[in-house]
Amino acid sequence: MXXXXGYLEFDGARQQSFLYPLFFREYIYVLAYDHRLNRLNRNRSIFVENVDSDKKYSSLIVKRLILRMYEQNCLIFSIKDLNQNTSLGHTNLFYYQMISVLFAVIVEIPFSLRLGSSFEGKQLKKSYNLQSIHSIFPFLEDKLTHFNYVLDVLIPYPIHLEILVQTLRYRVKDASSLHFFRFCLYESCNWKNFDIKKTSILNPRFFLFLYNSHVCEYESIFFVLRKRSSHLRSTSYKVLFERILFYVKIQHFFKVFVNNFPAILGLLKDPFLHYVRYHGKCILATKDTPLLMNKWKYYFVNLWQCYFSVWFQPQKVNINQLSKDNFEFMGYLSSLRLNPLVVRSQMLENSFLIDNVRIKLYSKIPISSIIGSLAKDKFCNVLGHPISKATWADSSDSDILNRFVRICRNISHYYSGSSKKKNLYRIKYILRLCCVKTLARKHKSTVRAFLKRLGSGLLEEFLTGEDQVLSLIFPRSYYASKRLYRVRIWYLDILSLNDLVNHE
């Protein structure tokens, strides 16, 4: 992104105010569809292949689109003429797909520059990969053992499109780009109403940017409340309607409050407060009392309802006591458990026992939800009994086996940090038996006869696939392999989670 910023010659004054002219530059389309910017997107770029017309694309399409954008009202058309309006073989729908991808890349540039400048001069921990999803769990293991409560929050998403536009308005100062963005956003909703069976009209990167900008706005306000929690304990959020005057009002309130009540500033301030977000969910861990946790709960409710105009029910915010309740986060059920430890001490001729209690974070596999996902994808029934995968029976034997091995390996790696492996063994058993039943169905045989004919070597991939990775951590020996089933291992190369079938 730094090389792209230098190529575009952005400076501090221009990076937010002159984005709209980039829509008419051919080189920005090359940047938008570069494979490095789309490396995390499983959907192929529409520059490579269009699923609607099965045609290859080149820079000529970009020139045609730019010429059409120069024409007045070239992109405005009725819904009835959606598929009939074509330009040299390409529909207006396809051009809107290109614009949506381009808009996401252009508006990401100032955000990326701001994010990069915020990390300058800061020392980041190098003990583990910060990009990995599993890097969150060592952090939780170190911090949550000192806390009492966790606030489990389901982040709401605005149902009205204008809220998204208004949220973006405070970060992107280019009015022309915002008007163009509003037009594309409303047109995309019209397309969805026109044909609900269509696949995603706009690129997923476009909607991912909208969600990130929405959450970024929410977190910017939340962090202000976090730093000034002692001052805002009785303030109504109705005074925070206008984002432009938000910080002015807050600073004035702080100044008055400090002058009038200098003796009680630190009474309710909580320095031990940690915030973690993943996808549409976040947790707030603290050592507060139940009263203060309820105050934080209604802070969130009032923030979403009064400032973001989103109906947010208090039931979506759960207060979990770590010593008693489990909280679900990132596919794990986590809780704190007390492990008693007895130490025998010898002093001269006297000996005595010392009882110690160690707090440990336990992470369990939610077996019921995973079995539900496997049943939804036809790997088993709702009770967890393996069934044959009928849709894969037409594939080759090696393809079927490789698919099951890949799914089993992905699940094993992600849930390798579980405190107890019993549920993980059950999931592996379901996948292995489902694989055998699928192969037996393809060859029109029974499971017993199929295994008897091919022998036990068929399932060696399931047994050795994980050892090849774990052998890089532990030496190959009987005691080491036995230890692998007891220790918790967090793989620090897991960057994203996809569905079980398509994950590669």
Curated annotation (Swiss-Prot):
GO molecular function: RNA binding
Domain of life from the UniProt record: Eukaryota
GO cellular component: chloroplast
Keyword Membrane: no
InterPro entries in the cross-refs: Domain_X, Maturase_MatK, Maturase_MatK_N
Job of this protein: Usually encoded in the trnK tRNA gene intron. Probably assists in splicing its own and other chloroplast group II introns.
Keyword Electron transport found: no
Major subcellular site: plastid
GO biological process: mRNA processing; RNA splicing; tRNA processing
Name of protein: Maturase K
Entry similarity comment: Belongs to the intron maturase 2 family. MatK subfamily.
Gene, per the UniProt record: matK
PANTHER family: MATURASE K
HAMAP family cross-referenced by the UniProt entry: MatK
Keywords: Chloroplast, mRNA processing, Plastid, RNA-binding, tRNA processing
Cellular localisation: Plastid, Chloroplast
